[in-house]
């Protein structure tokens, strides 16, 4: 993931209401071959770099012309599977989706960094995902090979625009939320700035100086915990242990009891199956 110029800060952006641009990109758009979703031409205000989009339960996923259709549709299916994890055609947690819709949540898919030189409306919350970091075969190959960043970036926007607003006491990106309290334990203390060295007993040790306590560290922590519980990190310990050490469900359950309790609370209806990009197929 990279940061959108000016407006993208850390892993999220605050972006305002949608109307159509006068200028559209005169490109023939393939509708794709997905049985559940259709690629359509895009002309939404603030997204003129992106020639097409797919709408998933009301959430816009935009792509520039150089993003592969297969990768766009893969991200779409990942979004659908996170939101409707049992794939019965109805989102599992309507409150979370409602908050995403209120925040006009979106995902933008890019090929080159310059694609992110955009100015989305100011009341929209967004996240970016790169074409070349999207690897549809990761899960179907037994969670091996190049990691599929759609598992991270799609989850970020759901957590940021959805869970944080639907359940502020539990998932609020602020000191004192259940999520932040659990994170403080995982980091070995409450660090408002990145320490030069985390305590030896910490298992979440993110050293990115651009990642602040609230809007970034909390969301990254939530991603690591949930995807580890879903199995995405089981073969990646050597790649990720400089940042996260509990790469399996059992390790999270045994060591990070606070976050495990939150994520298994049936009230929140968190995903229990790792998306593989094959929604209702």
Model-derived segments and spans:
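Bacterial Sec-dependent N-terminal signal peptides
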Residues: 13-37, 281
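Generic detector of solvent-exposed, compositionally biased contiguous segments
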Residues: 33-35, 41-42, 46-49, 78, ...
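Post-HExxH zinc-binding segment in Zn-dependent metallohydrolases
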Residues: 162-238
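Acidic/His-rich structured neighborhood in mature extracellular/periplasmic domains
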Residues: 56-196
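Pan-zinc metallopeptidase signature
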Residues: 215, 222-281
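Conserved aromatic-histidine-acidic binding/catalytic patches
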Residues: 63-70, 142-146, 207-219, 243-251
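Bacterial N-terminal signal peptides
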Residues: 3-14
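Start-of-domain marker
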Residues: 33-63, 67-71
């Amino acid at each position: 993931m990279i940061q959108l110029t000016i407006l993208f800060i850390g892993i999220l952006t605050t972006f305002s209401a949608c109307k159509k641009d006068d200028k559209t990109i005169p490109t023939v758009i393939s509708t794709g071959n997905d049985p559940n979703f259709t690629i359509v031409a895009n002309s939404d205000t603030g997204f003129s770099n992106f020639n097409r989009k797919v709408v998933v339960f009301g959430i816009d996923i935009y792509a520039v012309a150089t993003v592969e259709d297969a990768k766009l549709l893969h991200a779409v299916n990942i979004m659908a599977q996170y939101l409707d994890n049992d794939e019965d055609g109805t989102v599992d947690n309507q409150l979370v989706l409602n908050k995403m819709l209120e925040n006009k949540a979106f995902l933008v898919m890019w090929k080159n960094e310059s694609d992110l030189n955009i100015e989305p409306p100011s009341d929209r919350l967004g996240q970016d995902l790169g074409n070349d970091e999207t690897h549809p075969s990761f899960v179907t190959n037994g969670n091996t090979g190049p990691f599929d960043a759609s598992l991270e970036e799609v989850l970020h926007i759901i957590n940021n625009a959805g869970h944080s607003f639907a359940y502020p006491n539990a998932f609020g990106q602020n000191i004192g939320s259940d999520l932040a309290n659990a994170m403080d334990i995982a980091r070995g203390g409450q660090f408002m700035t990145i320490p030069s060295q985390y305590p030896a007993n910490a298992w979440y040790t993110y050293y990115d100086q651009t990642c602040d306590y609230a809007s970034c560290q909390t969301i990254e922590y939530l991603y690591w915990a949930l995807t580890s519980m879903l199995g995405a990190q089981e073969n990646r310990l050597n790649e990720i242990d400089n940042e996260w050490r509990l790469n399996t469900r059992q390790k999270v359950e045994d060591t990070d009891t606070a976050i495990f309790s939150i994520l298994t609370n049936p009230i929140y209806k968190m995903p229990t199956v790792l998306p593989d990009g094959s929604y209702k197929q």
